[in-house]
Design a protein with these regions (language model features):
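NAD(P)H-binding glycine-rich loop region in Rossmannoid oxidoreductase-like domains
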Residues: 1-37, 41-44, 59, 130-131
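Oxidoreductase cofactor-interface core, primarily capturing Rossmann-like NAD(P)-dependent enzymes
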Residues: 2, 9, 44-49, 56-157
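Short, small-residue-rich loop/turn micro-motifs
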Residues: 16-18, 54, 96
Length: 157
């Protein structure tokens, strides 16, 4: 039972993703239903802080890649469910993920033009959002950039 597992946790960081090679059914089960189940469990267990990895521009249908439409649909609606959940959320929408060492420099928000970000830098960003009040109840794109993670998050508009 998920609620029992997370009882007593300070926060949930949801990073699960179906990957690019699963069908629409797995995408919906993992990226949408899995996210919603953890949101529901968080509320039942009294865990108020919830951070989720989404997808770059998941909030902008006009920018969705046609070949990845089921993925974007799942991320979009998971984001919307989280925003309406009453939880203290942060939605992090990374650009294209790359398997390179972290550089610990990012660009966030409207200034984050389509680009890539290392998986390690996404992880560092997620940890930095945990207690950064400027990220509470916010959703933003993130790519590798010029500012330190702390500076970028503190300056998020």
């Amino acid at each position: 039972d998920l609620e029992k597992v997370i009882t007593g946790a300070d926060a949930i960081i949801f990073t699960a993703g179906s990957g690019g090679h699963t069908g629409p059914d797995k995408t919906l089960l993992i990226d949408l239903d899995g996210a919603v189940k953890t949101m529901e469990a968080a509320k039942q267990a009294g865990v108020e802080r919830y951070i989720m990895v989404s997808a770059y521009d998941a909030d902008k249908r006009q920018n969705w890649n046609e070949g990845m439409r089921p993925y974007y649909v799942a991320k979009h609606y998971a984001d919307r469910m989280l925003e309406a959940s009453g939880l203290n959320y942060t939605i992090v929408r990374p650009g294209g993920l790359v398997n390179e060492p972290a550089i610990c420099k990012i660009t966030v928000g409207a200034e984050a033009k389509p680009s890539t970000i290392t998986r390690e830098d996404v992880a560092h960003t997620l940890i930095a959002t945990l207690e950064n009040k400027n990220t509470y109840r916010r959703a933003f794109n993130v790519v590798n950039g010029e500012d330190s993670i702390e500076t970028a998050l503190n300056n998020l508009k």
